[in-house]
């Protein structure tokens, strides 16, 4: 099983950050955070972009994939993963299928399916359903590749993840403000996309 132990001084810093965030909405350094943005947000944005090019699935795929990095550059909230690590330098090669690991996979799977379902519900028509699905899927894909990279940190995956970490916001929003900001952002993108119909 992947060790989640942290040096004592890092655990202390994370406790201090958590105590500060319980008192008020805040931003904390992502240096000690290895979670991910809600996949549903990425899927909704990818679906919204795909709805603008309903007859061009290849363009939807490229734009959806690129949108992931643009959104990750914005400070946002992450949900915690108990066993899977996705931070810089993460290594999941010794990950075992414990209850914590299965819970993490279940949460991520529900998140991804919910995002795909919402994207299809909000944007898909009879003639664009596959394009919307492609846009939503590719918008979530970089986080899946990030996990694959923790298992096989080589080649193009390594170069992609270096870029992913570089562009990713180093500040994290917390609490209700963090959750609300993502809901508001996804809603705003959806409204903007539908205004072009």
Where would I find each of the regions flagged by the language model?
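N-terminal non-cleavable signal-anchor helices
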Residues: 2-3, 29
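Short linear motifs in low-complexity or flexible loops
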Residues: 3-5, 14, 18, 24
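N-terminal membrane-targeting hydrophobic helices
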Residues: 25-197
């Amino acid at each position: 099983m992947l060790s989640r132990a942290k040096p004592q001084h890092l655990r202390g810093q994370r406790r201090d950050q958590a105590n500060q965030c319980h008192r008020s909405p805040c931003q904390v350094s992502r240096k000690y955070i290895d979670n991910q943005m809600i996949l549903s947000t990425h899927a909704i944005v990818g679906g919204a972009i795909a709805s603008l090019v309903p007859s061009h699935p290849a363009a939807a795929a490229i734009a959806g994939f690129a949108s992931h990095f643009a959104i990750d550059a914005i400070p946002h909230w992450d949900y915690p993963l108990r066993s899977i690590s996705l931070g810089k330098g993460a290594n999941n090669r010794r990950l075992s299928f414990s209850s914590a690991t299965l819970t993490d996979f279940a949460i991520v799977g529900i998140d991804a399916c919910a995002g795909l379902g919402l994207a299809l519900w909000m944007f898909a028509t009879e003639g664009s359903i596959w394009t919307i699905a492609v846009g939503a899927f590719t918008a979530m894909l970089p986080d899946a590749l990030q996990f694959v990279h923790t298992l096989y940190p080589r080649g193009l995956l390594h170069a992609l993840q270096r870029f992913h970490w570089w562009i990713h916001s180093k500040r994290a929003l917390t609490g209700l403000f963090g959750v609300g900001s993502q809901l508001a952002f996804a809603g705003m993108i959806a409204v903007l996309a539908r205004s072009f119909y």
